[in-house]
């Protein structure tokens, strides 16, 4: 398995929808984010009558023998509420045993830098222990605790005039894996991810509140040694019925890595083809796959100074996107303009 190829695709899915054009926190589009792979607490899903998922299931076929092992990795974003506080009185240092007196504000300009309330994200991944084909089932619960931190904001006189308050809510997920025999040396592998985070009074809560207790952009990476996964898109004829019986919920697995190798499955909330790749013309994450890279880049280049000022204040990822675009050489922009590529072969066009 070429880990770099798989991780490039996985990271593109992980941050799809993280920030949408026009890349400003104040835009309407960015008040409704993270529609891919969001698993809400079970109680909130029930309150929303299933319109918000709490469960993701991957099913695929694995061929192997007594020497075959496989690994299960779940990756997602954990949202962090970022609030901005303005101190009532400037301080030299933050107190160590309590919080200073402050009030929350939507934005705060400190030393020419804009700080604004937002939802940041932390990358998370959890793994089951390496399994073999003798294991009928494996279940593991993962818990991430609630945390709250304060980051001081200093003015040009080195006085603390504000704080960034970051609050991460508790998340509890259960990952289970089941193996069943399809035929000699062929097995059905079922991996379920469930959000079992306690979430009281769910019927009165907003989606934004629920997202803080959710796994976002959730996806599964399956890898095997001494075994082979079967393509669900183009299975061999003798396994077509077994593939059709696979039930995938809120996700779909495809072969990933070097084309032709069958040791990795990437199960994504965004439907992909086998062996997905990042285009050579791509210069980095734009977070908005619903748009064309060239058009997004040109739009960023034409933002006003005020719009760029707000964009820089979102977070480091968005600031890096702006800086990368502003410094992009003309030849890189021309590469995005167009390229002739051959069609991938499949059973349908051979």
Where does each model-flagged region fall?
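Hydrophobic alpha-helical segments, principally membrane-spanning helices and signal/leader peptides
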Residues: 1-2, 289
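Extended, highly charged accessory segments
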Residues: 53, 64-350
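N-terminal ordered "arm"
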Residues: 3-65
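Catalytic cores of nucleic-acid ligases and guanylyltransferases
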Residues: 2-3, 327
């Amino acid at each position: 398995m070429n880990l770099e190829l798989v991780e490039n695709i996985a990271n593109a899915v992980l941050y799809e929808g993280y920030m949408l054009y026009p890349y400003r926190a104040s835009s309407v589009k960015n008040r409704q984010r993270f529609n891919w792979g969001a698993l809400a607490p079970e109680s909130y899903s029930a309150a929303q009558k299933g319109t918000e998922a709490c469960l993701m299931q991957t099913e695929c076929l694995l061929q192997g023998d007594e020497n075959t092992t496989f690994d299960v990795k779940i990756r997602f974003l954990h949202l962090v509420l970022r609030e901005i506080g303005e101190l009532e009185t400037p301080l030299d240092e933050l107190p160590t045993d309590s919080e200073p007196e402050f009030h929350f504000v939507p934005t705060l300009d400190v030393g020419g830098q804009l700080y604004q309330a937002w939802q940041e994200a932390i990358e998370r991944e959890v793994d089951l222990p390496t399994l073999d084909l003798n294991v009928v089932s494996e279940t593991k619960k993962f818990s991430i605790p609630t945390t709250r931190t304060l980051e001081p904001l200093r003015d040009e006189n080195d006085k603390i005039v504000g704080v960034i308050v970051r609050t991460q809510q508790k998340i509890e997920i259960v990952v289970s894996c089941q193996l069943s025999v399809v035929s000699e040396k062929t097995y059905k592998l079922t991996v379920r991810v469930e959000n079992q985070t306690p979430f009281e009074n769910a019927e009165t809560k907003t989606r934004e509140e629920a997202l803080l207790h959710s796994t976002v952009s959730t996806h599964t990476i399956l890898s095997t040694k001494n075994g082979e996964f079967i393509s669900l898109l183009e299975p061999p004829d003798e396994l077509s019925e077994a593939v059709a019986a696979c039930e995938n919920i809120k996700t779909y697995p495809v072969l990933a890595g070097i084309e032709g190798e069958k040791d990795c499955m990437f199960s994504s909330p965004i439907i992909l083809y086998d062996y997905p790749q990042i285009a050579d013309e791509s210069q980095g994450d734009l977070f908005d796959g619903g748009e064309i890279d060239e058009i997004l880049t040109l739009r960023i280049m034409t933002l006003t100074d005020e719009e760029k000022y707000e964009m820089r204040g979102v977070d480091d990822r968005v600031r890096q996107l702006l800086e990368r675009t502003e410094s992009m050489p003309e030849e890189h922009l021309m590469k995005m303009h167009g390229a002739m590529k051959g069609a991938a072969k499949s059973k349908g066009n051979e």
